[in-house]
Amino acid sequence: ASPTKTPLKKNQTVKPVKNNKKSDAASYKVTDVKKKTVTYSKTKTTSKKAVVPDTITVNGTKLKVTAVGASAFAGNKKIKTVTLGKNITKIGTKAFYKAKNLSQITVNGNTIKSIGKNAFSGVKKNCKITVRAKDKKQYNKIVKLIKKAGAKKVKFAYKKKK
């Protein structure tokens, strides 16, 4: 008999399964069971690079990663590079707060709708934030949101992406 799937619940903390092994590098919180969405809630990685994926698989169900949770990378002194997946619409309050060695962030500007307070406060001076956007207008809108979220003394780069 095949194992029974446990139904997902809203606000449940889940970990993705890769190659039949549970990944302990990151935790996700279920945000919408019907829409199959999750928030990247925290990392346990000791790696210098982190990739917030487009999707994760839990109990055989593919879930879209649509947000970086509040304080997800806050105070992380190891992380240097973060790449956010194409489905991210929200970056939570203090998501990268005082991640003082964080020197490179890549975001998809076409999908981001909101960025929480102090999300980028305390990242490394001259941190390079690459914004992938469909056009300069969208790029400028996201740069404004990132600056408002505490990104002082950072460099921005525009990368055209449909």
Spans of model-derived segments:
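N-terminal-proximal low-complexity accessory segments that begin disordered
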Residues: T37-S41, T130
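Short, aromatic/basic amphipathic alpha-helical patches
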Residues: K137-K153
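Acidic-aromatic substrate-binding/catalytic surfaces of carbohydrate-active enzymes
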Residues: S41-T43, A74
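Beta-strand/loop substructures that line and gate deep hydrophobic ligand-binding cavities in soluble
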Residues: G122
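Structured segments of extracytoplasmic/periplasmic soluble domains
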Residues: S71, G75-N76, K98, L145, ...
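Structural signature of tandem-repeat unit edges
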Residues: V30-D32, T45-A67, K77-K90, K100-S114, ...
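Intrinsically disordered, low-complexity repeat and linker tracts
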Residues: A1-T31, Y40, A149-K162
